[in-house]
Amino acid sequence: MLNLHLLYTLEITYSVQSRIVIYIKYYYSVSYMASLLHSLSSRPIIVYYSLYCTSPSIHNGML
C-alpha cells in the first residue's frame, strides 16, 4: 500500500513537472515570436527591401 501511494505521488509530481515544462516551452516560443516581430518592426526598411526583392521573382514564376 505504501509503495502504491509512493508511485501515485511520483506520478502526480511527474505530470505536474511535465506540464510546467510544456508551459515553459510555450512561454519561450511566444516570447521568441514576440521578440522576432519586434525586431522585424524595428527594421521595416530591411523587411520592405526583402519583400521587394522576392516579389518580382514570385510574379515571374506565376507568369
From Swiss-Prot:
Lineage of source species: Viruses, Adnaviria, Zilligvirae, Taleaviricota, Tokiviricetes
Protein name, as recorded: Uncharacterized 7.3 kDa protein
The organism of origin for this protein: Thermoproteus tenax virus 1 (strain KRA1)
